Amino acid sequence: MVKLAKAGKNQGDPKKMAPPPKEVEEDSEDEEMSEDEEDDSSGEEVVIPQKKGKKAAATSAKKVVVSPTKKVAVATPAKKAAVTPGKKAAATPAKKTVTPAKAVTTPGKKGATPGKALVATPGKKGAAIPAKGAKNGKNAKKEDSDEEEEDDSEEDEDDDEDEDEDEDEIEPAAMKAAAAAPASEDEDDEDDEDDEDEDDDEEDDSEEEAMETTPAKGKKAAKVVPVKAKNVAEDEDEEEDDEDEDDDDDDDDDDEDDEDEDDEEEEEEEEEEPVKEAPGKRKKEMAKQKAAPEAKKQKVEGTEPTTAFNLFVGNLNFNKSAPELKTGISDVFAKNDLAVVDVRIGMTRKFGYVDFESAEDLEKALELTGLKVFGNEIKLEKPKGKDSKKERDARTLLAKNLPYKVTQDELKEVFEDAAEIRLVSKDGKSKGIAYIEFKTEADAEKTFEEKQGTEIDGRSISLYYTGEKGQNQDYRGGKNSTWSGESKTLVLSNLSYSATEETLQEVFEKATFIKVPQNQNGKSKGYAFIEFASFEDAKEALNSCNKREIEGRAIRLELQGPRGSPNARSQPSKTLFVKGLSEDTTEETLKESFDGSVRARIVTDRETGSSKGFGFVDFNSEEDAKAAKEAMEDGEIDGNKVTLDWAKPKGEGGFGGRGGGRGGFGGRGGGRGGRGGFGGRGRGGFGGRGGFRGGRGGGGDHKPQGKKTKFE
């Protein structure tokens, strides 16, 4: 290559060029223009003044790709082109610059590829720097790689500076739309040649890549494939390949980089299109999502029943179609002289609904058994509506104090009008409880009045309403369901752990219900509930049996107060405070002593670890805590009589809070300890933990004076 002067001497006044885009070309005496290229050329030529008659070798540009946002500007009048003194200046073919409105081609010399358009830097004096590593023609000399790298770096700087000129250059070109048509035809012919000769990239360096120009006003850049040079002498190409083998390697690397950039630009343009379509797709998807719930709601074809007398039909053969199932169901009922108004099949075809004309037909249909439709024995029952649970509760009774060995058949003999009987059991063992459901609420009320206190295998049963009716009953309610200040239930405490319900039944002969709470191991918790048919019976038992000895222990009896009774102690909570404990009492023993308790904690000395004689017992609900408190009032645990009280709720200074306060003379920590006690929220152990915090807070500058209370 010809080494171009980077800081040439000041040249004569340059010749001003016509409005861009135009090409710069020098006359070449030694090169000939091919006829095809002369036909293709449509741009204007500007001759750069030559100095000292020296001829510079023609430079050829390698492939270049310009991003849509980057424009290439030809030399402007402010730019002075300089050639190396002492050498003959040769024509430097300019690379064809294409705009959406006008295409300009530049004739190239024979044996040389068209050069890249000279890039001008406004206001900068010096030699015009050609594009990336140009190759010499027939008279070109090979240059060192260092000089080539310097040329590339300066060219990159010029390219960056020319970005500001792009908009001014594009607009004049857009006004000449008349010249665009011929150029476009030539470009189409040359595009075909480009496609055929893609495999000759390494041998033919005269090939140029597509240049993209961005139209003004933000329009999408049009891609135009420039013309490939024609009629290049093969012998000269081979000579150039031998001479510039090293340059080809560098050019190929640069070409690959340019191609990668072009591919990235195309990918960005392709990615923009789906983004525009996304809103529409989202709307369609949202519409589908909105429609989905409606489809889910419609589980049955024609969900609206035609009559008020409906029957649920289950276990249908879902392998059949809905019309087939409708016909089959209608035929089955028609054979039994039942007229079907309509049949509605579920979407899964596993169930359906049948509408009848009258309640009589519906009742007759419910009495049918063993009906088969397409080989499946269908299930018939009344449909379950929104209020079905409420209705079932109103016509259902709870029977308690049943013999543990009683069966459904035996109960069926007692409750003749019962529609369904469900025995309650746990781990395979009966709990002496059953639910008796009737067809109507009137039947349930009638049975409640007539069968209350009926004996079964020597045990007097107790009946209760379920649902809303049962909420108005006494805790151990009976026939008189509302509280009138006269309880019918006795709470028995200090009961021997070996005592059973059968043992108590022998003592309290008039009792209608007896319950001895047991722990997980089946061991008695030391208290019981004894219910009578009337307040008089309960009061009589209280007066005659209180402090009576049963299996070696003197029992204590008291009337049970109702939930929310004015006689109940104020501010109940879920936690009981228990004091008077033996030092030998463990947390497990304390927990087992209270029916329904979920955990228990005993407060211990932080230094010795021995019990302080009090603790806390937690329950799931206030009701459970109340019942346990009444049962264990003045009771004994491990031989010690205990005293019960409600644990103070948060904000009222629980016992643990006081412990924390005493331990926290260390300042702030002590205060935190007190609040920790309040945080016990009646759960005892947490209050003790507050005391522990008080001790820790007391540390620091002073020796802790509180005692650590450790739980769990």
UniProtKB/Swiss-Prot annotation:
<feature type="modified residue" description="N6-acetyllysine">
    <location>
        <position position="15"/>
    </location>
</feature>
<dbReference type="GO" id="GO:0005737">
    <property type="term" value="C:cytoplasm"/>
</dbReference>
<feature type="modified residue" description="N6-acetyllysine">
    <location>
        <position position="429"/>
    </location>
</feature>
<feature type="modified residue" description="N6-acetyllysine">
    <location>
        <position position="16"/>
    </location>
</feature>
<feature type="modified residue" description="Phosphoserine">
    <location>
        <position position="593"/>
    </location>
</feature>
<feature type="modified residue" description="Phosphoserine">
    <location>
        <position position="153"/>
    </location>
</feature>
<feature type="modified residue" description="Asymmetric dimethylarginine">
    <location>
        <position position="689"/>
    </location>
</feature>
<feature type="modified residue" description="N6-acetyllysine">
    <location>
        <position position="116"/>
    </location>
</feature>
<feature type="repeat" description="4">
    <location>
        <begin position="91"/>
        <end position="98"/>
    </location>
</feature>
<feature type="modified residue" description="N6-acetyllysine">
    <location>
        <position position="102"/>
    </location>
</feature>
<feature type="modified residue" description="Phosphoserine">
    <location>
        <position position="565"/>
    </location>
</feature>
<dbReference type="InterPro" id="IPR035979">
    <property type="entry name" value="RBD_domain_sf"/>
</dbReference>
<feature type="modified residue" description="Asymmetric dimethylarginine">
    <location>
        <position position="675"/>
    </location>
</feature>
<feature type="modified residue" description="N6-acetyllysine">
    <location>
        <position position="648"/>
    </location>
</feature>
<dbReference type="InterPro" id="IPR012677">
    <property type="entry name" value="Nucleotide-bd_a/b_plait_sf"/>
</dbReference>
<feature type="modified residue" description="Asymmetric dimethylarginine">
    <location>
        <position position="662"/>
    </location>
</feature>
<comment type="function">
    <text>Nucleolin is the major nucleolar protein of growing eukaryotic cells. It is found associated with intranucleolar chromatin and pre-ribosomal particles. It induces chromatin decondensation by binding to histone H1. It is thought to play a role in pre-rRNA transcription and ribosome assembly. May play a role in the process of transcriptional elongation. Binds RNA oligonucleotides with 5'-UUAGGG-3' repeats more tightly than the telomeric single-stranded DNA 5'-TTAGGG-3' repeats.</text>
</comment>
<feature type="repeat" description="1">
    <location>
        <begin position="58"/>
        <end position="65"/>
    </location>
</feature>
<feature type="modified residue" description="Asymmetric dimethylarginine; alternate">
    <location>
        <position position="696"/>
    </location>
</feature>
<feature type="modified residue" description="Phosphothreonine">
    <location>
        <position position="303"/>
    </location>
</feature>
<feature type="modified residue" description="Asymmetric dimethylarginine">
    <location>
        <position position="683"/>
    </location>
</feature>
<dbReference type="InterPro" id="IPR034233">
    <property type="entry name" value="Nucleolin_RRM2"/>
</dbReference>
<feature type="repeat" description="2">
    <location>
        <begin position="75"/>
        <end position="82"/>
    </location>
</feature>
<keyword id="KW-0694">RNA-binding</keyword>
<dbReference type="InterPro" id="IPR034235">
    <property type="entry name" value="Nucleolin_RRM4"/>
</dbReference>
<feature type="cross-link" description="Glycyl lysine isopeptide (Lys-Gly) (interchain with G-Cter in SUMO2)">
    <location>
        <position position="372"/>
    </location>
</feature>
<feature type="modified residue" description="Phosphothreonine">
    <location>
        <position position="84"/>
    </location>
</feature>
<feature type="compositionally biased region" description="Acidic residues">
    <location>
        <begin position="145"/>
        <end position="171"/>
    </location>
</feature>
<keyword id="KW-0597">Phosphoprotein</keyword>
<feature type="domain" description="RRM 4">
    <location>
        <begin position="574"/>
        <end position="649"/>
    </location>
</feature>
<feature type="modified residue" description="Asymmetric dimethylarginine">
    <location>
        <position position="672"/>
    </location>
</feature>
<feature type="domain" description="RRM 2">
    <location>
        <begin position="395"/>
        <end position="468"/>
    </location>
</feature>
<feature type="repeat" description="3">
    <location>
        <begin position="83"/>
        <end position="90"/>
    </location>
</feature>
<feature type="modified residue" description="Phosphoserine">
    <location>
        <position position="358"/>
    </location>
</feature>
<feature type="compositionally biased region" description="Gly residues">
    <location>
        <begin position="652"/>
        <end position="698"/>
    </location>
</feature>
<dbReference type="Pfam" id="PF00076">
    <property type="entry name" value="RRM_1"/>
</dbReference>
<feature type="modified residue" description="Phosphoserine">
    <location>
        <position position="34"/>
    </location>
</feature>
<feature type="modified residue" description="Phosphoserine">
    <location>
        <position position="41"/>
    </location>
</feature>
<dbReference type="InterPro" id="IPR034230">
    <property type="entry name" value="Nucleolin_RRM1"/>
</dbReference>
<feature type="repeat" description="8">
    <location>
        <begin position="128"/>
        <end position="135"/>
    </location>
</feature>
<feature type="modified residue" description="Phosphoserine">
    <location>
        <position position="67"/>
    </location>
</feature>
<feature type="cross-link" description="Glycyl lysine isopeptide (Lys-Gly) (interchain with G-Cter in SUMO2); alternate">
    <location>
        <position position="579"/>
    </location>
</feature>
